[in-house]
Amino acid sequence: MMCNLLLSFSVLLLSCTHLVAHPVTDTADMTYSGPDSVEEAGGVSPDDFAVSDLNDLLQRAAVVEYSPLLSRENIKVPGQIPKEALRELLLEKPYRLIPPSGLWGSRRQFRKRGGGADCFWKYCV
């Protein structure tokens, strides 16, 4: 009896942890009581942010393949928050985060041949 209770409690606990890990889908109901300005938040200016720290951050962002942006010297971050620069990098080249289509087994698109009398459907001889 005690074993069944312990087993059911552990299964319940394990299933709840997966539900808690999901992000909130509707953020309109949530209130944000953060600072009103960057000065209150203690934001980091681009001059205070070390170039080596930014390089480490960009290397972590380029997960799939090497980005030529990582080797640039004197990287300047526009604005007050380095997250904006990272977001611009990710939105600029989104194909770097997607693995090549050959790994997914996708086929090439069908291309019609001109003047093919020996064709049946899409198979031409």
From Swiss-Prot:
Identify the stretch annotated as signal peptide in this record.
Answer: 1-21
Pfam families to which the protein is assigned, alphabetical: Urotensin_II
Example GO molecular function term? hormone activity
**Keywords on record:** Cleavage on pair of basic residues, Disulfide bond, Hormone, Secreted, Signal
Pro-sequence positions in this chain? 109-111
Which cellular components does GO assign to this protein?
Answer: extracellular region
Where in the cell does this protein reside?
Answer: Secreted
Disulfide topology: C119-C124
Q: Does the record's keyword annotation contain Transmembrane helix?
A: no
Which one GO biological process term can you cite for this protein? blood vessel diameter maintenance
Q: Can you tell me which family this protein belongs to?
A: Belongs to the urotensin-2 family.
Q: Any idea what job this protein has?
A: Urotensin is found in the teleost caudal neurosecretory system. It has a suggested role in osmoregulation and as a corticotropin-releasing factor. The non-hormonal portion of this precursor may be a urotensin binding protein, urophysin.
Indicate what this protein is called per its UniProt record. Prepro-urotensin II-alpha
